[in-house]
Amino acid sequence: MKVLEERNAFLSDYEVLKFLTDLEKKHLWDQKSLAALKKSRSKGKQNRPYNHPELQGITRNVVNYLSINKNFINQEDEGEERESSGAKDAEKSGISKMSDESFAELMTKLNSFKLFKAEKLQIVNQLPANMVHLYSIVEECDARFDEKTIEEMLEIISGYA
């Protein structure tokens, strides 16, 4: 086996998540398809999806990891019941809520700033919510950008988080 082009391009978490969710749907590994498959098996139909349990498990784990909001902190008491819609939505990552159009729009807006490709990739993957987080991603942020520009960047990013 010969490597033709080494590290031709980077993939964002959104692109990986989209590919893997499409793979789940294609091979009937998503929750809706699995429920429908169980129901059809009970009726006697034998629809066999692509059977590769290791790939299915890895795909499910990666999709679950990418769908979780890493910045979410559960601040509820143990005895309280949480609201299913509001809490579940807060636990989802920003990239799991994005569409192709919103992802392209975010990238277009980030292209208006003088950021390196790796910095844009990190911003899209992490969707920083505060200045400290953005400073950890953007190299020499205080020297390259003034405070107004940084606030503008954070405002744009918060619209997609």
UniProtKB/Swiss-Prot annotation:
Keyword Transcription included in the entry's annotation: yes
Compartment(s) where it occurs, according to its Swiss-Prot or TrEMBL record: Nucleus
Nucleus found in the keyword field: yes
Residues making up the signal peptide according to the UniProt record: none
Biased composition (Basic and acidic residues): 82-96
Annotated segments matching region Disordered: 75-96
A Pfam family assignment: RNA_pol_Rpb4
Record-linked InterPro entries: HRDC-like_sf, Rpb4/RPC9, Rpb4/RPC9_sf, RPC9
One GO term describing the cellular component: nucleus
GO molecular function: nucleotide binding
Any one Gene Ontology BP term: termination of RNA polymerase III transcription
The entry's keywords: DNA-directed RNA polymerase, Nucleus, Phosphoprotein, Transcription
Chief location bin: nucleus
Subunit structure: Component of the RNA polymerase III (Pol III) complex consisting of 17 subunits. Forms a Pol III subcomplex with RPC25/RPC8. Interacts with BURF1/TDS4.
Function according to Swiss-Prot or TrEMBL: DNA-dependent RNA polymerase catalyzes the transcription of DNA into RNA using the four ribonucleoside triphosphates as substrates. Specific peripheric component of RNA polymerase III which synthesizes small RNAs, such as 5S rRNA and tRNAs. The RPC25/RPC8-RPC17/RPC9 subcomplex may bind Pol III transcripts emerging from the adjacent exit pore during elongation.
Similarity section: Belongs to the eukaryotic RPC9 RNA polymerase subunit family.
Note: Present with 2930 molecules/cell in log phase SD medium.
Record's protein name: DNA-directed RNA polymerase III subunit RPC9
